[in-house]
A protein has these predicted regions:
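Active-site-proximal segment of RNA-dependent polymerases
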Residues: 73-120, 124, 169
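Non-catalytic, polymerase-adjacent accessory regions of viral genome-replication enzymes
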Residues: 1-54
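Short linear loop/turn motifs
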Residues: 25-32, 98-100, 149-156
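Localized chelating/binding microdomains
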Residues: 18-26, 42, 61-63, 67, ...
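An N-terminal domain-start capping segment
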Residues: 1-12, 99-100, 104, 142, ...
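A general alpha-helix detector
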Residues: 7-8, 80, 133-137
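Short, conserved non-catalytic motifs in the polymerase core
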Residues: 34-78, 95-97, 153-173
Length: 186
């Protein structure tokens, strides 16, 4: 395991570019640093595929997804965190979402000619990733417990990864790395 940042003062000075006092203020008042709105979502094809009235009720109509983009100051801090993660922790080779120089086309090409392909869309993916799982990932990749705690508080909201934050995709890729490795062996 690589040793990453072990002290909060180093995190603040070299990655976040803020004082420890400002860090503590943001964490203590994190709800002031996010916007929340509902985004309508519709999947008319799911109702056709499932062809069951109880599913058509949900999937054949609009429902909403909660979006929590951060305000500018926290967004800039999260961009710094994301840059540090991307530059210092190798992304899993099977991760394509949010990874530079990878896209859906490259992902599809690796499955070309396979007899079986499994595809799924995880409903409420980011809300499913709890702050506990994010904290455990930060410790697993090499941050100290104290730094992992601060990073978790800066990158999660209401107990989970927020939809709309610049760090969410990278963190999700890292959180699910052990699961992805298990799936690769099937």
């Amino acid at each position: 395991m690589t040793m990453l940042i072990q002290r909060v003062n180093i995190l603040c000075s070299t990655v976040l570019h803020i004082s420890i006092d400002r860090l503590n203020y943001i964490i203590a008042n994190i709800e002031k640093f996010y916007i929340e709105y509902q985004k309508p979502k519709r999947d008319k094809n799911a109702a056709k595929r499932l062809n069951k009235p109880q599913y058509q009720e949900r999937y054949g109509k609009y429902w909403s997804r909660t979006i929590n983009p951060p305000h500018e100051e926290l967004k800039n801090i999260q961009k710094c965190i994301n840059g540090y993660l991307v530059n210092n922790i190798p992304m899993p080779d099977f991760a394509y979402g949010g990874v530079k120089e990878k896209d859906n086309i490259l992902n599809a090409k690796q499955h070309k000619g396979r007899k079986y392909v499994f595809q799924t869309d995880l409903t409420d993916f980011y809300p499913f990733i709890s702050c506990k799982r994010v904290y455990e990932m930060f410790v697993r990749v090499g941050f100290s417990a104290d730094v992992a705690s601060k990073l978790t508080k800066l990158t999660t909201f209401k107990g989970h990864l927020p939809q709309g934050a610049p760090t969410s995709t990278t963190i999700a890729n890292l959180v699910f790395e052990p699961t992805g490795r298990k799936l690769q062996t099937l």
